[in-house]
From Swiss-Prot:
It comes from the Bacteria. GTP binds at D23, H24, G25, K26, S27, T28, N140, K141, I142, D143. Residues 11-193 form the tr-type G domain. Its EC number is 3.6.5.n1. It is found in: Cell inner membrane. Its main location: membrane. This is Elongation factor 4. It comes from Agrobacterium fabrum (strain C58 / ATCC 33970).
């Protein structure tokens, strides 16, 4: 379906996003806004229209930013075009959030009236303020018996420092107060600005891109200056690639083709782009023949932060896994992978992710959408090394670590973590951060909740920090982080040896102070899981040549003297010595079978 769009004047456009913590009702509010402006017919409405992936709906999180264009007839009789960009709320997708926010001029800050401000709300609000957004505060879930709107308003003013006296009170579930939200968007959020209008050279921000089976890569753009039309030759300023625009349209949330997009408008284009990796979020799109002089600021390619190996449980599934990661890569440029082989687990891929949630989601999508059974090795972060000959090197896999003699220094990434928690759990959380080599930088109270800021090594967080935090605080603490810098650390490579052979999939880089604890835990876990063989199996954790922990799996033995009735003791001695000799030889040549479950359990080992 195609419409000939007459250009909407700038002062009748509002571009906004919704900023909220997980579960505070962001996607439900988006549904209500779509419904009340007639964006979708009743029969097409589904819960969380904008969360199109199953995982997004089930976990109640938004992963990919989505957009929708709504037409709203305001109380003053004018019709406005509202472009809502739905942003992910999770810390792993912080870069996506910052790009989505830079495409808008204002944000709705949605806070649950019963729960108050959470850590991720803070992180995203600060990003919105960095982008000079006008904020409209919306208190959601005011129909709940536990709602305390007045207390939460005070909390917003104390914690975030913005005036919440004129907050809009709504219940997105029942639809209460939705008209007030629409009026607030029109009256309180600013319209987009354009320096040169539609006659200047094209300048557009690439907000997002995804892969469509029929149309190839679809690119979501926000036009700043100039006009984007069908048939135009465009150029990506970050990569220098050129494309011909085949189709221009808007999402309402259905795709509707239009002839062109002008300043302030948000829509999509397709242009025979082969894969999503060619369209980098945050890049500037311009006309190839008449380019704009300056690209938009703030563009940086997404860098993977956490790495882990993914291996198929059944080696025969390797080709299916190769096809599956290739398909996911089409839709997610921040996910990277390369082939790797492990003596214990066979062939698989070393994959890079933006963070732990990203890793979990990719793994779940591979298992779910492609029916694969996978084993993931222990997650590791990217280390920077300076070698003795002066060269700089990045280390993604602990197994590739060069000889200690060649390393001058190793630097690891550090994060700044903000934790919000009810104060009764404060002691346990401080101890957890202390145990993980954290440096406390701030501790403030807001009512009965504490806000703690810590600097922590990312290496200590990727393992199971989040799970431990949730269990200490019974699920009440919220956590948000961003990477600040790389710092030198006393890091050592810990290898696990089974029967004298190193098991590559279990080697990891640890801080020297935590090596004992980690090594002992790993050996004890493996001792429980490796079944007894006919010979005794030593399990050791070693740093370089020094063994720091050891457990032994006892041998099974046959009673070889059972057939001797009485008689000479030397006869029994001879049989026992012969058995001992056999066991010795067996230990030399025997291979230890480590069951798959042992790997999975050892890698999931909780750092108690």
């Amino acid at each position: 379906m195609s419409t000939n769009s007459t250009r909407t004047p700038l002062d009748h456009i509002r571009n906004f996003s919704i900023v909220a913590h997980i579960d505070h009702g962001k996607s439900t509010l988006a549904d209500r806004l779509i419904q009340s402006t007639g964006g979708l017919a009743e029969r097409d409405m589904s819960e969380q229209v904008l969360d199109s992936m199953d995982i997004e709906r089930e976990r109640g999180i938004t992963i990919k930013a989505q957009t929708v264009r709504l037409h709203y007839k305001a109380n003053n009789g004018e019709t406005y075009v509202l472009n809502l960009i739905d942003t992910p709320g999770h810390v792993d997708f912080a870069y996506e959030v910052s790009r989505s926010l830079s495409a808008c001029e204002g944000s709705l800050l949605v806070v649950d009236a019963s729960q108050g401000v959470e850590a991720q709300t803070l992180a995203n609000v600060y990003q919105a303020i960095d982008n000079n957004h006008e904020l409209v505060t919306v208190l959601n879930k005011i129909d709940l018996p536990a709602a305390e709107p007045e207390r939460i308003k005070e909390q917003i003013e104390e914690v975030i420092g913005i005036d919440a006296s004129d907050a809009v009170m709504i219940s997105a579930k029942t639809g209460l107060g939705i008209p007030d939200v629409l009026e607030a968007i029109v009256n309180r959020l600013p319209p987009p600005k354009s320096d040169v209008g539609e006659n200047g050279p094209l300048k557009a921000l690439l907000v997002d891109s995804w892969y469509d089976t029929y149309l190839g890569v679809m690119v979501l753009v926000r036009v700043i200056d100039g006009v984007l039309t069908k048939g135009q030759q465009i150029r990506m300023m970050g990569s220098g690639a050129k494309y011909g625009v085949e189709r221009v349209g808007v999402l309402t949330p259905k795709m509707v083709n239009v002839d062109s997009l002008g300043p302030g408008e948000i829509g999509f284009i397709t242009a025979s782009i082969k894969e999503v990796a060619d369209t980098r979020v945050g890049d500037t799109i311009t006309d190839d023949k008449r380019p704009t002089a300056q690209a938009l600021p703030g563009f940086k390619p997404a860098q993977p932060v956490v790495f882990c190996g993914l291996f198929p449980v059944d080696a025969a599934d390797f080709e299916d896994l190769r096809a599956a990661v290739g398909k996911l890569r089409l839709n997610d440029a921040s996910f990277s992978f390369e082939m790797e082989s492990s003596a214990a687990l066979g062939f698989g891929f070393r994959c890079g992710f933006l963070g732990l949630l990203h890793l979990e989601i990719i793994q779940e999508r591979l298992e779910r959408e492609f029916n694969l059974d996978l084993v993931a090795t222990a997650p590791s972060v990217v280390y920077e090394m300076t070698l003795t000959d002066g060269t700089e090197k990045e280390l993604h896999n602990p197994a590739d670590m060069p000889d200690v003699v060649k390393i001058k220094e190793i630097r690891e990434p550090w994060i700044k973590a903000t934790i919000l928690t009810p104060d009764e759990y404060l002691g346990g959380i401080l101890k957890l951060c202390q145990d993980r080599r954290g440096l406390q930088t701030e501790l403030t109270y807001v009512g009965n909740r504490a806000m703690i800021t810590y600097e922590l090594p990312l290496n200590e967080v990727v393992f199971d920090f989040y799970d431990r935090l949730k269990s200490i605080s019974k699920g009440y603490a919220s956590f948000d982080y961003n990477i600040i810098d790389y710092r030198e650390g006393d890091l050592v490579k810990m290898s696990i040896l089974v029967n004298g052979d190193p098991v590559d999939a279990l080697s990891m880089l640890v801080h020297r102070s935590a090596a004992d604890r980690r090594g002992r835990g790993m050996c004890e876990k493996l001792k429980e899981l490796i079944p007894p063989h006919m010979f005794q199996i030593p399990i050791q954790a070693a740093i370089g040549g020094k063994v720091i922990a050891r457990e032994t799996v006892r041998a099974l033995r046959k009673d070889v003297t059972a057939k001797c009735y009485g008689g000479d003791a030397t006869r029994k001695r001879k049989l026992l010595d012969k058995q001992k000799e056999g066991k010795k030889r067996m230990r030399q040549f025997g291979k230890v079978e480590i069951p798959q479950e042992a790997f999975i359990a050892a890698l999931k080992m909780n750092d108690e």
